[in-house]
Amino acid sequence: MNSLKSLCLKCIVTLCLLVNAFAFDYASLQEQDENLLAACPQYITIYTNGPVPGTTTIYPTSNVASNTSENYPYTGSKSLSSSSILSNSTISTSSSTPITASVPTSSSILSNSTIPTTSPVPTTSSTPTSSSILSNSTIPSSSSISASTITTTIISGSTQFTTTFVDQSIDTVEVVIPTAGYITTTLTSGSSYPVSTTTLQTVSGTQSGLVEVITPSCGCNPENSFHLRLVGDSINPSYVYKNTNVSDPDEGNMYTSTEGNTEAVNVFYYDPTVERILTCDCVRPVYTIYTDDPDSSFDIIKNNNGTFTFVESSSGEIQTLHVSQYGALWITSPEYDGETGGMDDVGFRADDVILVAY
């Protein structure tokens, strides 16, 4: 299959998956990418003002823009009725004196019995058994039970954690968000960035305070970032950058810098999970094929020496890179390279160049 393809780097944040060469539908693929995976998902990360013990931390569901932070005031508690308390609980009072109250279960109470849960619990109580309660009877209010241990799951943004709250009251449970203990929050940025964690410590009791919500943004670091340089171009040195002023998207917008112009050189990083090059500003390059050959696709493989190889998916043939007179990058198949006049028609300024990460 003779093919001539241009390398297009569109400034969008959709994930570019490998294209099926026999069922290529770019519009559907792009829509599918937008629905399934975004190039720059935002995960909310919660920090206290420190973080230090004694600072109240809450987990709001609000999000903020990248590279910004915002303070959220918070004061409050949550009440749960005693009817939601599990049976056979041990209640801890503020004086640390345990009061054990066993709620009668179906095995110890005859049918049609009613257990009220609205009256205070005495310091001592005896649990009615099946031998002391007649059918259709009502259990005295002195056998009511008060608050106990509550387990609550809090969901905030992309973080889900479970923590246990313990408190004592007459017929309500005060749930403080958060309670004593450690909460581990995982922050993630991009699809292949190393995952890092931070541990926040908070204290029990209802408090007022501020919480700082920080949303990490995509970005490169010295370990994973690089420039793209072309070896073999007629202009030396020759770097790769994005030309956002291209009017025709089919012509591509991945260009090489002209002589003496290095200000527009972009910084990239390589995502090995999808074998694609991404920019550090959270833009995943979308490599499109030239419209002369809409049924083919190609893979990009990063070699151990930092160079990149372009392989056509349908045939497994290694593609070659060329630079046009205007500095645009082109990919051609071996068949096209062998055609008489094919290369001359385009007028490349450099043939068989190599894309190198450095």
From Swiss-Prot:
InterPro entries: DIPSY, S_pombe_Mam3/Map4
Segments forming domain DIPSY: 207-358
Keyword NAD: no
Region annotation (Disordered) ranges: 90-144
Keywords: Glycoprotein, Repeat, Signal
Glycosylation-annotated residues: N67, N88, N112, N136, N245, N305
Region (2 X 36 AA approximate tandem repeats), start-end ranges: 148-218
Signal peptide: 1-23
Compartment(s) where it occurs, according to its Swiss-Prot or TrEMBL record: Cell surface
Top-rank taxon, per record: Eukaryota
Any Pfam family matching the protein: DIPSY
GO cellular component, one term: external side of cell wall
Repeat (Sequence) residue spans along the chain: 148-180, 181-218
UniProt KW Signal keyword: yes
Biological-process GO terms, alphabetical: flocculation
Family membership noted in the UniProt record: Belongs to the mam3/map4 family.
PANTHER family the UniProt entry points to: M CELL-TYPE AGGLUTINATION PROTEIN MAM3-RELATED
Function field: May be involved in agglutination during conjugation or other aspects of colony formation. Induces flocculation when overexpressed.
Protein name: Putative cell-type specific agglutination protein pfl7
Protein species of origin: Schizosaccharomyces pombe (strain 972 / ATCC 24843)
Name of the gene encoding the protein in the UniProt record: pfl7
